[in-house]
């Protein structure tokens, strides 16, 4: 499994407009081969974190290179982000617990 951790800080006053773009990108991500899930969080200090999971690197790469996603990335750099970072990780081990 490939996990992408995307951390960003938005410019003042753009959150509502940005969320509309992010919602569209989330819809698009779901159509990519090997897509598993994604979740986004806003922290109190203004940082936004999105975690995206793909079954394999090919799916993540297809997502990264998708033309609509590339256009959205460019727009976000120009208009919405003060800063961002991306970490791509391969899961070496996974553990979980669910109380019934």
Q: Where are the model-predicted features located?
A:
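Short S/T/G/P-rich N-terminal loop/turn motif that feeds into the first structured element of a domain
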Residues: 1-48, 55-67, 81-100
